[in-house]
Amino acid sequence: MAGTAAHEILEGLELDHIGILVKDLDSAVTTFRTLFGYRQATVPVVNTRQKVRVVFLEKEGSLPLKLFEAVEPNSALARAARSGGVLHHLAYYTDDLEGTIESLVSLGARVLSPPQPGEAFDDHPIAFLYVGSGMNVELVTTRDWRGRIRAAAPARTGTTAEPADAMDLERKVGGSDGI
């Protein structure tokens, strides 16, 4: 793909979220809620393909955060998280996943994970690429996250689950293994 055509496709990308690999998901959620005012937007979801447990946080006027922890203690992700949180990736929304991948590869990126259903995204396709300078990029094809608290919360006098209740909500609805 010619550089100009690749750049035209990439101009349409929109930064969607920041992915942070954490050592302990529950603790990290509490930290971001307490120190920075984020609210938990989803119940934790286990991504069986990538072997991580994921939760999204939101804050008015800020990009969403995707916090995730490794579920396999000896995985490369678990080893990377042992010293604490790590900026793992920037995620971009695209409506042309294949074209975006082709464009990025033509400009020197390397595919780490080809398109596959993203369990935290209601199985809409996602892909991961290494773009150089130690940075990974996730490409997402939907802005709808699985396990949104507003949709998953039990009825409670017309309100949604409070951020402090989100981890309890996961336990009450039987965990997040039913993916």
Per-region residue spans from a language model:
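Short secondary-structure junctions
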Residues: 36-46, 107-116
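Conserved active-site tyrosine of GNAT-family acetyltransferases
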Residues: 28-33, 104
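A contiguous binding-surface segment within folded domains or other stable secondary-structure elements
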Residues: 60-80
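A short, acidic/glycine-rich surface segment
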Residues: 43, 74-78, 123, 148
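Acidic (E/D-rich), amphipathic helical modules within compact regulatory domains
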Residues: 28, 39-59
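Vicinal oxygen chelate
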Residues: 2-11, 14-23, 53-58, 65, 77-103, 127-130, ...
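Short Gly/Pro-enriched loop/turn and capping motifs at secondary-structure junctions
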Residues: 72, 97, 118
